[in-house]
Amino acid sequence: MALLQIAEPGQSAEPHKHRLAVGIDLGTTNSLVATVRNGIAVCLADEAGRSMLPSIVRYHADGRIEVGQTAAAAHTTDPKNTIMSVKRFMGRGLKDVSHVESTPYDFIDAGGMVRLRTVQGVKTPVEISAEILKTLGARAEASLGGPLTGAVITVPAYFDDAQRQATKDAAKLAGLNVLRLLNEPTAAAVAYGLDNASEGVYAIYDLGGGTFDLSILKLSRGIFEVLATNGDAALGGDDFDHRLFCWILDKAAIEPPTSDDSRRLLMKAREAKELLTASEEAPIRARLSSDEEVNLVVTREEFATMTQHLIAKTMAPMRKVLRDAGLGPEDVKGVVMVGGATRMPHVQRAVAEFFGQEPLTNLDPDKVVALGAAIQANVLAGNRKDEDEWLLLDVIPLSLGLETMGGLTEKVVPRNSTLPIARAQEFTTFKDGQTAMAFHVVQGEREMVKDCRSLARFELRGIPPMVAGAARIRVAFQVDADGLLSVSAREMSSGVEASVLVKPSYGLTDDEIASMLKEGVEHVGDDMHARALREQQVEAERVIEATTHALEQDGALLNADERASIEVAIAELKQLAAGDDPRIVKKGIEALARATDEFAARRMDNSIRSALAGHKVDEIQV
C-alpha cells in the first residue's frame, strides 16, 4: 500500500533490524506494558509474574520512590504521599477534579495544572506519571534484554491537547521516545482486528478506572478508520466505587467519616465491586477509627440499582456516536469491551440490550489496549512484514476554528476529521490600512465564539497597508497523529508569518467535555439565527464605516439633500442593526446601498478624471 511508505514518527529506515518497541497502557487504576514476540502481542510481567502495575506512586521522606504494589500497600498508612489515579489530574486544574473531598491529597492550585504537596516537595501529575512510565520502561528493558527504540502510549479518545501534551511530557521525563499517542479504543480495535481478522463496523465500549470512551470504527481491507468518538473524561470505575462507598456510609450511619475511615471504606467498596463480578453478593467488613465495626452485605442487584445512573450516563454518548457515524445499533457487527469496569455484569447486560447482541470479551479487557498499542509500536518501529501492512486512521473529536469579526466561529477543521490533517483558509482585513491581525483559535461546535472553548491567541504583524479586503492572509491548521495542533498565518504578498503551537494551560472541565457536543445539537437553531444576525450586523458596521469614510473624503460631490438622504439611511441602518432580526438588518443594508448608488458612481467618475488629468490619449495604457 503506497500510503504506508510515508514514515511515521520514530520509524527507522533500516528495514531488517528488529527494534525493541513497546505499547504502554497508562491507565487510571492499572498500567501495562506489552510487546510483540514472534508475531504475537504479549503483556510483559514483573519478577513476580504480574502484568498489571497499579498506577500508584509513593514518595518517602528519605528520597525513595515506590511504584505499584508496594506503594499500594501504604495507601491507608501514608495517604498524602501515596498518589492514586493520577491520570484524572493530567492537564487539569483543581476546579476540574471530581470528588476532591474523598481524596487525602494536599492539592495546590497555582494556576494551570494542579499540583500535589508530598514529603519530597510539590509534584505535578506529569512527574508522578513519569515514575509509572519509568517503572514500565525498566520492566520492558529487563524483559527484552536491551534499550527501547520507543513506545506507543495510549490515551482516552477524549483527552484534549493539554492532557495529551502532559502525557508526552511525562514520557519524555521518563526517558521514553514516544512513537505515537494512540487513542485507547483504537488500540483495542487494532488488537481485535488483527487477532481475529474481522472486517466491518465495530463499537468500542471503553469503561476504565477514570474515563469512558465510545468509538465507532470501520475495519476494512487493512484500513482501521475511526468514524466517530464520544465519551466522558470524568466517568469510570472509580465512580462506581464512590457510589458504593456512599451506600456504605448511609447503611452504617457514618456521618461524617474521618479521612482514615473514608480511605478504608473506599478500598472495601472497590473490593466488594470486584467480588460482585463473579458472586451474587459480597461482604463489607471494616473496623473504623472509633473501634466501631462495619458489617454489611451488598448484593449484585443492589449494586446494579445504586449505579444505574452511571450506566445511564454511558447511554447518551452511545446514541450520539451512532448518530454522528450515520448508523443504527443494527449496523454494528460487534461490540468490543475494554477496561476492567466492563467486567461488571450489569454493564455487559446494558450494552447487550442496547446493541441487541452479546459484547465481545474473548480478549482480556484489562490487557487489550496494551496489546493493540504493542502491535502499533511494532509497526512504527519498522518490524512489520510486507503482508502485515495496514493503515490506522484516528479522528479529531471536536471542531477547530477561528474567531471572525463579530465573535463568530469559522470552523477550519470539522470534528471527526481523520488525523493527521492539514487544512487552510484565506482571510482578509476589515479596515483600510490594517497592518496587524489578531487570531483566536477555538474548539467546539457552537456558532458563537463565546460558546466555544478558547485554545490560543496570536498576532500577525507587518501586513502591508492596503484597502480593506485587499490583503490575503492564509491560515493553516495542522493536527498531528497525536491530536496536537499548530496554527500558522501568512500574508501572501509580503510573506510575513506567525504561528502558535497549541498547548493549553489545562484541560477541559468535566462539564465542558460532557456538554459541548450536546449543546451543539440542542442549540443549533438558536445558534444559526445568532450567527445570521451577527453576520448582518458585521456587514452593517462595515458598510456604515465605508460610507462615513466616503462622505468625509468626497462629500463635496453631493448637494445638501443628497447628503441628508444618505445620513438618514445610515441612521436607520444603525437602528435596525441593534435589533434581533437578520432579515430586517439585511434590508437596511440594501436600502443604504440604494441611497449611495449615485454617490458611488460620481466617486468612480471623479477617480477616473483624477487619474487621467494631465495625460494625453496616446499615453494611456490599456
UniProtKB/Swiss-Prot annotation:
**Molecular function, one GO term:** unfolded protein binding
Q: Which UniProt keywords apply?
A: ATP-binding, Chaperone, Nucleotide-binding
Write down a Pfam family by its short name: HSP70
InterPro entries per UniProt = ATPase_NBD, Heat_shock_70_CS, HscA_NBD, HSP70_C_sf, HSP70_peptide-bd_sf, Hsp_70_fam, ISC_FeS_clus_asmbl_HscA
Claim: Cell membrane is one of the keywords in the record: no
Q: Which GO terms describe its biological process?
A: iron-sulfur cluster assembly
Q: Which PROSITE patterns match?
A: HSP70_1, HSP70_2, HSP70_3
Q: Which SUPFAM superfamilies match?
A: Actin-like ATPase domain (SSF53067), Heat shock protein 70kD (HSP70), C-terminal subdomain (SSF100934), Heat shock protein 70kD (HSP70), peptide-binding domain (SSF100920)
Briefly state the protein's biological role: Chaperone involved in the maturation of iron-sulfur cluster-containing proteins. Has a low intrinsic ATPase activity which is markedly stimulated by HscB.
Tell me the protein family, please: Belongs to the heat shock protein 70 family.
HAMAP family per the UniProt record, alphabetical: HscA
This chain belongs to the protein called Chaperone protein HscA homolog
- Recorded source organism is Aromatoleum aromaticum (strain DSM 19018 / LMG 30748 / EbN1) (Azoarcus sp. (strain EbN1))
Query: What phylogenetic lineage does the species belong to?
Result: Bacteria, Pseudomonadati, Pseudomonadota, Betaproteobacteria, Rhodocyclales
